[in-house]
Amino acid sequence: MIRIFALITALAITVKCQDDRRPFYVIGHMVNSIPQVSQFLELGTNAIESDVEFSENGTALRTFHGLPCDCLRRCKESADIVDYFQYIRNVTGFRHSEYSEKLLLVFLDLKVSKLPPESKYAAGVDIATKLVLHLWDGVPFYDAMNVLLSIGRASDMAVLTGAIDTIIGFDPSLSLFNHVGFDVGLNDKLENIAKMYERLGVNGHRWQGDGITNCLVNLRSPLRLKETISYRDTNKRESYVDKVYYWTVDKVATIRKTIRRGVDAIITNRPKRVTGVLEEDEFKKTVRPATYRDDPWMRLQSKTTGRGNELDSDMDEMGDEASEFDFEPFSYPLSPRRPLSSRSPAIRDSYNVWPQYNPLSPFY
């Protein structure tokens, strides 16, 4: 009887202590040089977005955005793609790596829409090969970096096909797909993106964004963002969206408004502003920064505040646009990663099914 009472008490404490706030991803925008990785992480990001430039034949060359880019940003920062992946592997991939618990997701904006059609499959093959050989190779399974492969348009589907086929070729066990997600980033119609995923046989790990450059984001209609959130929050067959993000958001008023809508992530040039808003009384009871314990592919439905449906006709005030990037780096406390307690379907097999895996069993 005493043992039963103790067990019931322990279960009650576990349920009571469970944190049901939405895990939120603060994605640093245009992190295209190696020094910028640590800069953005020290400023509060838990994910980074990088732009990948390809040669005409589909070879991934470097991280680079170029002109034009966001207001008040330098557009020409870059790094060799292999050096970039190896750096991230070194600072995240092992138990006592400097950012092993801080950097949760690398969002790769694959600049492939202008490639010749015959080069798009090759681009997927090449970026996946470089990920396997230079980011994931030799890294323990639970420490492997999560990567979001973002193409511009649904018409770029061949890139994802090439990447998927290549990863399967390297890893017939399909375990690496637990660390891979997908996105279509340039505001295509959602129904077209849904059809693309159906053709690919992908039914999990799908992020979906909406937005525009920070120079114009305050003029953008919220209708597509609302539609994207509704895709996540319904269970219809075409409702493919697992995570919703908005880009590129720098002003505090717009950050607040976007979080009220129930997004899972914001891409920003000003991460300290986003983390500051997350600490405000209105939000800190319902939203929190994501940690390594959170599954970046898990779908969570909206819990908007009472102000979540307010009118959007008001324009955001001009905030302080002083740079946040003049600072002295400081050391971050280190502690080992631990495995996630559960995992959602992650792997496409040859029958276009993404099987469930037992989270208690090793994947390697």
Swiss-Prot record:
Keyword set, alphabetical order: Cytolysis, Dermonecrotic toxin, Disulfide bond, Hemolysis, Lipid degradation, Lipid metabolism, Lyase, Magnesium, Metal-binding, Secreted, Signal, Toxin, Zymogen
Top-level division of the source organism's lineage: Eukaryota
GO BP terms in the entry: killing of cells of another organism; lipid catabolic process
Binding note for cofactor: Binds 1 Mg(2+) ion per subunit.
InterPro entries the record matches: PLC-like_Pdiesterase_TIM-brl
Localization terms from the record: Secreted
Enzyme kind, highest EC tier: lyase
Keyword Methyltransferase: no
Residues holding Mg(2+): 49, 51, 109
Tissue specificity annotation: Expressed in salivary glands.
Catalytic site positions: 29, 65
Enzyme Commission code(s) on record: 4.6.1.-
One GO MF term: toxin activity
Signal sequence, renumbered to the chain: 1-17
Reactions catalysed: an N-(acyl)-sphingosylphosphocholine = an N-(acyl)-sphingosyl-1,3-cyclic phosphate + choline; an N-(acyl)-sphingosylphosphoethanolamine = an N-(acyl)-sphingosyl-1,3-cyclic phosphate + ethanolamine; a 1-acyl-sn-glycero-3-phosphocholine = a 1-acyl-sn-glycero-2,3-cyclic phosphate + choline; a 1-acyl-sn-glycero-3-phosphoethanolamine = a 1-acyl-sn-glycero-2,3-cyclic phosphate + ethanolamine
Cofactors named for this entry: Mg(2+)
GO cellular component: extracellular region
Disulfide feature: 69-75, 71-215
Family that this chain belongs to: Belongs to the arthropod phospholipase D family.
Role of this protein: Dermonecrotic toxins cleave the phosphodiester linkage between the phosphate and headgroup of certain phospholipids (sphingolipid and lysolipid substrates), forming an alcohol (often choline) and a cyclic phosphate. Acts on sphingomyelin (SM). It may also act on ceramide phosphoethanolamine (CPE), lysophosphatidylcholine (LPC) and lysophosphatidylethanolamine (LPE), but not on lysophosphatidylserine (LPS), and lysophosphatidylglycerol (LPG). It acts by transphosphatidylation, releasing exclusively cyclic phosphate products as second products.
Protein name (database record): Dermonecrotic toxin SPH
Protein's gene: SPH
